[in-house]
Amino acid sequence: MSEVLNVVPVIPLRDVVIYPSMTLPLNVGRKKSIEAVKQASNSYNNYILLATQKNGSSSGDVVDNIYDIGTLAKVVQIMKLPDGSLKIIVEGIAKRLVAKYESIDGCIYANLDSLHIDDNYDPSQIDKELKAILLSITDSLKKFVDISGKVSKESLATLINTEEPHKFIYEISTILNTEIAKKQKILEATDIKNKALLLLSCLYEELEILELEAKIKDRVKSQVDKNQREYYLNEQVKAIYKELGEADEESEVTALKSRIEATKMSKEAKEKCLKELKKLKAMPPSSSESAVSRNYIETILSLPWGKKAKVKKDINLAEKVLEKDHYGIKKVKERILEHLAVQIKRDTNAKAPILCLVGPPGVGKTSIGQSIARATGREYVRMALGGVRDESEIRGHRRTYIGSMPGQIIQKIIKSKTENPLFLLDEIDKISSDFRGDPSAALLEVLDPEQNSTFNDHYLEIDYDLSKVMFVATANSLDIDPALRDRLEIIHLSGYTEIEKQAIAKQYLVPKALENNGLTKNEINFTPKATLDIIRYYTREAGVRNLQQKIDGVCRKAVKNLLKDPEHGKVSITQNNLEDYLGVHQFDYGIKNAKPKVGQVTGLAWTSVGGELLTIEALAMPGKGKVKYTGSLGDVMKESIDAAFSVVRSISKDYKLEDDFYEKKDIHIHVPEGATPKDGPSAGIAMTTALVSVYTNKPVRNDIAMTGEVTLRGDVLAIGGLKEKLLAALRGGIKEVLIPKQNVKNLADVDKEILEKLEITPVNSIKEVLERVF
């Protein structure tokens, strides 16, 4: 090399060391390395430094991760690949010491040290000791090639005949799987003896590993041969036993027979198992039929024959568990306690009705089932019936089908490991049927106390007693097959009121959210008004599932703020900062009218998510007595308007109206929020009041709301959903509520807090209503 180079571009190498005198191809993909090749070609007469990275997997600064000694090489050929990378052929020239690496304009450069460290071949250096080391290397290399087979005989002969020791050492180092750090030490070594000893050490390590691998392979091969020999001998023994007509008392069959005899299964089940075991003996162990028989016997043995959980008979404990786990729903808890009390009082084998908890989503139907299990000490198993269409999900598949298995009922019983678990049939109203059968028909036998003592699963083909199981079903609606519904005792769970939701949030939801998000009471606090605003403005549901999600959302944001600002202190969630956590209000609720108006009446409506104020508007215009009603009204509500007209005409003289008053004006009745369908008879008295107000031109009090159905005789009939309607009235700022006198008995279900803040006026007739509203 005639040129004297002080600075050259650098290609950092990963997991490879390139030695002088080597010519080999390299794939170049990194941007800095591609730039180094370009600079070498354009400005450095194709000279480049090939230096190895200390850590090939590091993604940090490459400049600080390169060895100080590398190989100066010349780029012989450059090829561009389609993906933008390069393939180059380099020829190693000499090893050089680097004084400093620098990264300039996307390329790494090496400032070469003036110290000359080239490996020059001097025959006088080869003494007896070096010759002995080189001979040991040659012998070890031959062993290495014999075991690994990495190098052909021709290449080995060429390698052994290499005269120059440096080149000989470098060539051998290249074919070894030695660590990169050790290969780098071989490059850096200046003394030829040290270089040779380093290589010999690497060779010995490689030989030791290869010999160990060979021993392991031999051991595995001998074990496989032994297993094959044992299998062959076992098959011969079986054939001899078969020829002699003697039973092959295999350990597995013997163990199965012992288990069958020891299990307290029914007589029918034991006979079936022994019959199947006899068939299993005559089958080859490797046949698919033997696997089917074995699985069948194991399934029957895994059933909890005679194993029962000790049922707790403490009704006070059951009451405490239900009170602790669920707020409110007093009637539901009372009915469940009555059911448990009867079971405790009567014989445990007595047939009990099947409970079915019906209510909207999120009111706690499934968790009530879990609480009953805890209160009674039974194991809890749950089967989700939503979307089940196949009868085999309940009864199982017959064994003639490949991959057959028991139905979910039997599988869950096996999982519970007891004969008397609490079995929750979740979402029983979501069952549907198709060409594969009707699952609800299969459930008839399961849920009938008169029949489930002999439940027959298609897979088992034997009767299994389910009478000890306590079944509880849940549903969102009563849209259940009539025959199936007839076997259930329905318990209705209504939606929670705002007051109940506030209490549930305080006692259950907020503590749960704090625990789930790693918070403590000292780090965050929800004010009662903030909780109420979450209920009113961010959720609209009968249950509390969305409320839990919103509270979780607030907690997550609070955790983020606390981590970003540890000095922030305790987070307090109030009405004023709630929008910072949950955004703008998502829902609104009805409030009373700003002032009394003619023809505008506040009614009360019940929805699946609670009560609502229902504004009813009536407008009179000159005309010929036509009536128009808008607001997505249902047939029942339209008929209620017609009835109201008749009532108004019948009492017209009381308000000094002319006989033909209704023929001179057209009436338009509208119920706002026209996109929302509305129906039902409970707005009858409100409709009548609106019409009287229009015809007499008298404004209706804005602080009064009413609910009740009206008859043609002017009588006021009872309505439903009174509790929810009164809460909506209180929330909307109403002072007085007119209710049917027949509904006075329902006030016992209403919270005292609501009754104390509202003036409840029972009415019998429309005349009593009209006396209060003007």
From Swiss-Prot:
Residues 595-774 form the Lon proteolytic domain. It holds the Pfam family Lon_lid. The active site is at residues 682, 725. GO terms for biological process: cellular response to heat; protein quality control for misfolded or incompletely synthesized proteins. Residues 8-207 form the Lon N-terminal domain. GO terms for molecular function: ATP binding; ATP hydrolysis activity; ATP-dependent peptidase activity; sequence-specific DNA binding; serine-type endopeptidase activity. Keywords: ATP-binding, Cytoplasm, Hydrolase, Nucleotide-binding, Protease, Serine protease, Stress response. It comes from the Bacteria. GO terms for cellular component: cytoplasm. It catalyses: Hydrolysis of proteins in presence of ATP. Its EC number is 3.4.21.53. ATP binds at residues 359-366. It is found in: Cytoplasm. Induction: By heat shock. SUPFAM superfamilies: P-loop containing nucleoside triphosphate hydrolases (SSF52540), PUA domain-like (SSF88697), Ribosomal protein S5 domain 2-like (SSF54211). This is Lon protease. It comes from Francisella philomiragia subsp. philomiragia (strain ATCC 25017 / CCUG 19701 / FSC 153 / O#319-036). The gene is lon.
